[in-house]
From Swiss-Prot:
Function as written in the Swiss-Prot or TrEMBL entry: May act as a soluble regulator of keratinocyte differentiation. May play an important role in embryonic skin morphogenesis.
Subcellular location per the Swiss-Prot or TrEMBL entry: Secreted
Protein name: Keratinocyte differentiation-associated protein
Predominant location category: secreted
Signal peptide bounds: 1-22
Induction and repression of expression: Up-regulated in suprabasal cell layers of embryonic and adult epidermis.
Domain of life: Eukaryota
Keywords from the UniProt entry: Differentiation, Secreted, Signal
UniProt note on tissues of expression: Ubiquitously expressed in stratified epithelium.
An annotated GO BP: epidermis development
One GO term describing the cellular component: extracellular space
Length: 98
């Protein structure tokens, strides 16, 4: 079974950036609060751990490829990361000298 990693990573990064920017800047169209939603979504937020993602995007290591790959490996431990040779190969690559 193939799991589309790129769309999942893009969606998670957009969600983290959206939450980090304080959501919408204007007034809401309707009164929607977290109390309107069932409490069953708490498990999902603990699974995705948005606070950890926000802290990763605010740090100085935001553009560090190794930190980003380690963050996603820790956030998604159920994916077999050894299956992706490009991700595994980038960890051992020597950085380009400029």
């Amino acid at each position: 079974m193939k799991i589309p990693i790129l769309p999942i990573v893009a969606l998670l990064s957009l969600l983290a950036l959206h939450a980090a920017q304080g959501a919408a800047l204007g007034t809401p169209m309707e009164d929607t609060t977290s109390s309107n939603y069932p409490s069953g979504t708490e498990g999902l937020s603990e699974f995705l751990n948005f606070n950890k993602l926000q802290s990763a995007f605010k740090s100085d290591d935001f553009l560090n490829w190794h930190v980003l790959t380690d963050m996603f490996k820790k956030a998604l431990p159920f994916i077999n990361w050894e299956f992706f040779p490009k991700v595994k190969g980038l960890r051992s690559a020597v950085p380009d000298s400029q």
